[in-house]
Design a protein with these regions (language model features):
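N-terminal active-site segment of His-dependent metallophosphoesterases
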Residues: 65-69, 76-81, 88-93, 101-106, ...
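Ligand-binding face of N-terminal immunoglobulin V-set domains in extracellular IgSF glycoproteins
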Residues: 126-134
Length: 575
């Protein structure tokens, strides 16, 4: 998408279904899932008009500089730096954070203001970022967030956080993706997202990994900023107490919001520096002996699943934006936007980690999936397999955590691939999907729960945050009964729909036996992974134990009670 004109429909690909705004028409959940599951997205069509159907968004007091949507992220060094970020409904005067160790002296850190104007609605969003530096490792700090025009200045927002330990030390982190908001007036939101945030607090991690598709604002084009607001305010009960480290997903890509559609995401989050011109899109940080690498998979995937106009009406931005209507069939496809810069950065980061004796583990976070056998969701993407899996093999990545498909799936450790093992989904002809190959003998015992990841990488699909569209139905090869995956091996360009003037995006073009799939949760799509890292002793083993908790029955009725589904231990020789 260029800076000025309508997105080029010839290079756009995304699929979506939504009734034109203001018509009073609705799309059933069943129909929505059919389209969202088939193409990995949902759609946006119609004009952005005052009075369009929407969720309740009421402001009972005049907008001022009162802090809200408060969240923490790690700085470049989690042992000594935390960033406090927030938003306000109007510009804040002298926005600041007061911080100090428990019962100690308080320092004032002034925040930097960042704004963006939503490209569809013209709403100006004010955000603030205070970088707290010079902190001590493994230390608890209390802080207050306020401004001169904070209506709660007499009793400002306050919370606390704990910095990461220095050197090898045990710690806990949690992860899931695809969270949404509790406001059921928004497309794909569900009350389960409230319970998902509570689940993080139940397990008290040092930090949380949020694996993309944060709130699905691009599925609510007339109210994108309101959706973001509901999302961030919902998270405050956890994200103000511990860093929430995100990666962008396809639903963070929004029309007219920057070259990759990520202006909202990038304005709201301050993330570790990657030293490139694409700040905030990918990054890394180290806690204890674990290197965490966060990637933007939209740069390499074949599937187009970002902002999309299904038609038959164009998407018409608010007049104040000065932006042209977006034609039916347009989608925001960004594959290759970094021209290989992200992949080169990834290789350099992995190479340095391989030479660093203080790093035992490498965990990669991204949104889309290299290994997924979801039938009603998106499936796997050959683009990731081509660009990044060889690097994961070469440099010994231990674990990959993703979202995208709204379910839980765990792979065996994989290393290398089988060539020409897939088939065309329509013709049955052979297709090279680069089928990931399980490490020999790891799948001989399907009940095994301990794996040496020095021999291969385990992939986890953790897409059951809080979205209203669980996708816990998995593919089966009807010929042999084995798990089966659908795979995108080429772009899924929009094609004409069955209704005149509408467009859809095709599902994945290839199929393969999912010989790499070790565990799938057919009971519910919702859950949270809890990881406990034990650095071990010199000369011995180090372990990372994953307990996956799911919410039985939440597909039908939101459920706050998460129960243990499985426990898996990753182990390897400590450096």
């Amino acid at each position: 998408m260029t800076k000025k004109p309508v997105p080029d429909a010839s290079i756009a690909e995304t699929a979506v279904i939504e009734a034109p705004a203001g018509t009073g028409a609705t799309v059933s959940r069943r129909s929505f899932l059919k389209f969202a599951g088939a193409s990995g997205l949902a759609s946006a069509t119609g004009a952005l008009a005052a009075g369009a159907a929407r969720a309740d968004v009421t402001h009972t007091t005049p907008p001022d500089g009162s802090p809200e949507q408060i969240h923490l992220t790690w700085g470049d060094d989690p042992t000594s730096e935390v960033v406090v970020s927030w938003a306000s409904l109007a510009a804040s005067a002298n926005p600041r954070v007061l911080v100090g160790a428990d019962h100690g002296r308080r320092d004032t850190v002034h925040a930097v203001q960042r704004t963006y104007t939503d490209g569809l609605t013209g709403v100006v969003v004010f955000t603030y970022h205070a970088r707290l530096s010079g902190l001590k490792p493994a230390t608890t700090y209390t802080y207050e967030v306020t401004a001169d025009n904070d209506s709660h200045a007499g009793s400002p927002f306050s919370s606390s956080f704990t910095t990461a330990p220095r050197g090898r030390a045990p710690f806990r982190f949690t992860s899931y993706g695809d969270l949404a908001t509790p406001n059921t007036g928004w497309v794909l939101s569900s009350p389960q997202s409230r319970f998902a945030v509570d689940a993080v607090e139940r397990f008290q991690p040092l930090f949380h990994l949020l694996n993309g598709d944060l709130c699905y604002a691009n599925l609510n084009p007339a109210h994108q900023t309101d959706v973001w607001r509901d999302f961030a305010n919902n998270n405050q009960t956890s994200s103000t107490r511990r860093p929430w480290m995100p990666c962008p997903g396809n639903h963070e890509i929004e029309f007219y919001n920057g070259p990759q559609g990520l202006d909202s995401y990038l304005t709201r989050y301050t993330l570790p520096d990657n030293g490139s011109r694409f700040s905030g899109r990918w990054y890394s940080f180290q806690v204890s002996s674990v290197l965490f690498i966060s990637l933007d998979a939209d740069d390499v995937v074949y599937q187009d699943a970002a902002a999309f106009v299904a038609g038959p009406m164009p998407l018409v931005p608010a007049a104040s934006t000065g932006h042209a209507p977006i034609a039916p069939g347009s989608s925001f496809y960004v594959r290759g936007y970094s021209n290989g810069e992200q992949t080169r950065w990834l290789e350099q980061t992995l190479r340095r980690a391989a030479d660093d004796r203080d790093i035992d583990w490498i965990v990669v976070q991204m949104h889309q999936d290299a290994l997924s056998s979801s039938k009603t969701g998106n499936g796997s993407d050959k683009g990731i397999r081509e660009a990044w899996l060889p690097l994961f093999d070469q440099y010994g990545v231990d674990l990959v955590v993703c979202g995208h498909d709204h379910d839980y799936e765990r792979s065996y450790p994989v290393r290398g691939c089988n060539r020409h093992a897939g088939i065309d989904a329509k013709t049955g002809e052979a297709v090279d999907t680069l089928q990931p190959r399980p490490v020999p003998h790891t799948h001989a015992n399907p009940d095994a729960t301990t794996f040496d990841t020095s021999h291969g990488t385990i992939h986890l699909i953790l897409g059951g945050g809080g979205t209203s569209a669980p996708l816990d139905v998995y593919g089966v090869d009807m010929g042999n009964g084995n798990p089966q995956a659908q795979v995108f091996t080429k772009p899924n360009r929009p094609v004409a729909g069955t209704t005149a003037g509408t467009f859809v995006r095709p599902t994945a073009d290839a199929l393969e036996d999912a010989i790499w799939s070790a565990q799938r949760d057919t009971g519910t799509g919702y859950g949270i992974a809890v990881f406990d890292v034990d650095p071990g002793e010199h000369g011995g083993k180090t372990t990372m134990t994953m307990n996956y908790y799911h919410a039985p029955g939440a597909d039908q009725t939101p459920n706050p009670d998460y129960e243990l589904f499985e426990t898996v231990t990753l182990e390897k020789r400590r450096r």
